Each structure stands twice: as C-alpha cells, then as structure tokens.
Amino acid sequence: MSDTTQPPADDAQNVPPAMPLTINVQYIKDLSFEVPAGAEIFATLRANPQIAVNIDVQANRLQAEHPVFEVVLAIKTEALEAPEKEGAAPGRPVFIAELAYGAVVTLTNAPDELVEPILLVEVPRLIFPYVRNIISEVTRDGGFPPVVLQPIDFVALWQAKRSFPQTAGNA
C-alpha cells in the first residue's frame, strides 16, 4: 500500500448531459375558487360530489430574440352534487376551482425537435406538484375535503394536443 492517491477515474462519460432547461420563476397567474350556492350547500350536501377535472398546457415565447418561454398549466376542477337517482344528471355545482400556474423558463441549446416536448411535457411535469398542492389546499380551505389530483400523463396530453390545429403563438 502506498501513500499516493490515484487521480479519480474520468467520469465524464458517465455523466448524463445537462438538461437544456432553467426554470427562472414559478407563479400563480390566476386563481379562483367559487361556491355558487354559498353556505346553503354545506347544509344540503348529502353525498360526495362528482368531480371533473380539465387540464390544459400552453407555452409562449416571451421574447423573439431569446429562448425564454412562459408555460402555463391550467386546471379547472368542478364539483357537482351527485345525482339523486342512478343515471340521472348531476345536480348543481358545489364548487369550482380554477388555477393557471405559470413558469418562465429558459432553454439553452435545446435541439429544435426537443423544444416542444420540453415546454409541453417536461415543464408541466416539473410544476405539477405545486399545482396539485394549491388545488388541494384551496378546496380544503374552502370547507371541502381536499381534491388530490392524480398524476397526469403529459406525454399523452401533448400528443392529443398535436392532433388538433394550434393557434398562433403557442408552442
């Protein structure tokens, strides 16, 4: 055994390439929570409401000369009174929670073919835990059991979105 130390092996080949993405800031762009029936709903609600969730992701370049984008993950959660009879239409709205959660991101040397999936899949995947927490807290603070959003397949959402024409300015 000797007292000399061996230089560390070259691990450069084992290091994965850096993600060409920097999240500059995350923020609540818009938040709304409404109980249309007011206090009456707390006295008359007899069963767990039916909850519908709608999700959308938008991405827009903020400056033409810089690779800086705003990505917005929009969630609308609407709870309706359960139908009184099997197969009947749901009742009145119990609550409506809407959240538009934004992130300003910079892409550095991202290949052109990866820009769209990074913006519409990877960024929403990274900010989703914050969105999930906000929706849960808002519904709980509104006097209802917290709505815990289940994981979202952003790849499938992106692929479905690609099958429809896009409006100008969206990634």
From Swiss-Prot:
Q: Which of UniProt's keywords are assigned here?
A: Chaperone, Cytoplasm, Protein transport, Translocation, Transport
Record's GO cellular component terms: cytoplasm
Q: Which GO terms describe its molecular function?
A: unfolded protein binding
UniProt main location, coarse? cytoplasm
Q: Where is the protein found, in the record's own terms? A: Cytoplasm
Domain of life here? Bacteria
* GO annotation (BP), single: protein folding
Q: Name one Pfam family in it.
A: SecB
Q: What InterPro entries does UniProt report for this protein, alphabetically? A: SecB (IPR003708), SecB-like_sf (IPR035958)
The role this protein plays is: One of the proteins required for the normal export of preproteins out of the cell cytoplasm. It is a molecular chaperone that binds to a subset of precursor proteins, maintaining them in a translocation-competent state. It also specifically binds to its receptor SecA.
Which NCBIfam families does the annotation name? PRK05751.1-3 (NF004392), secB (TIGR00809)
Q: Which family does it belong to?
A: Belongs to the SecB family.
**What do we know about how this protein assembles, alone or with others?**
Homotetramer, a dimer of dimers. One homotetramer interacts with 1 SecA dimer.
Listed name of the protein: Protein-export protein SecB
Organism, per UniProt? Answer: Gluconacetobacter diazotrophicus (strain ATCC 49037 / DSM 5601 / CCUG 37298 / CIP 103539 / LMG 7603 / PAl5)
The upper taxonomy is: Bacteria, Pseudomonadati, Pseudomonadota, Alphaproteobacteria, Acetobacterales
